[in-house]
Amino acid sequence: MKTSRKITTQRRHRRIRRKVFGTAERPRLAVFRSHRHIYAQVIDDVAQHTLASASTLDRELREKFKETGTATQEAAALVGRSVAERALQMGISRVVFDRGGKLYHGRVQALAEAAREAGLQF
């Protein structure tokens, strides 16, 4: 029987999480992509604490998605820019990137590149 896409994504995410670990000096930028929305969090895994977050559900960003929708690369880029600005305000400039088991393509790639352009280093 063929392995489902969900199972392969979960396996890939477990494999990535074994290698990617966020600290206070260099937290983890975790990305979760659903069919409609995209979420990004800057996480300190040692303290198990979310330092900054942004998503397409944020009230500040919600008005910008009225024409384009939330499941687009433009929306992902806005979320990436927003989470990078929030992290930089907290004094975080270097992170490790956790793509959440998804391929580095499309919305995940757009979010990562926008976060880099906004000043995060990874």
From Swiss-Prot:
Example GO molecular function: structural constituent of ribosome
InterPro entries: Ribosomal_uL18_bac-type, Ribosomal_uL18_bac/euk
Keyword Ribonucleoprotein: yes
Keyword vocabulary terms for this entry: Ribonucleoprotein, Ribosomal protein, RNA-binding, rRNA-binding
Keyword NADP recorded: no
Gene3D superfamilies: 3.30.420.100
GO CC annotation: cytosolic large ribosomal subunit
Any GO BP: translation
Alphabetical list of Pfam families matching this protein: Ribosomal_L18p
Alphabetized HAMAP family for the sequence: Ribosomal_uL18_B
Assembly and interaction partners: Part of the 50S ribosomal subunit; part of the 5S rRNA/L5/L18/L25 subcomplex. Contacts the 5S and 23S rRNAs.
Family membership: Belongs to the universal ribosomal protein uL18 family.
Function: This is one of the proteins that bind and probably mediate the attachment of the 5S RNA into the large ribosomal subunit, where it forms part of the central protuberance.
Family matches, as NCBIfam families: L18_bact
Protein name, per record: Large ribosomal subunit protein uL18
Source species: Synechococcus sp. (strain JA-2-3B'a(2-13)) (Cyanobacteria bacterium Yellowstone B-Prime)
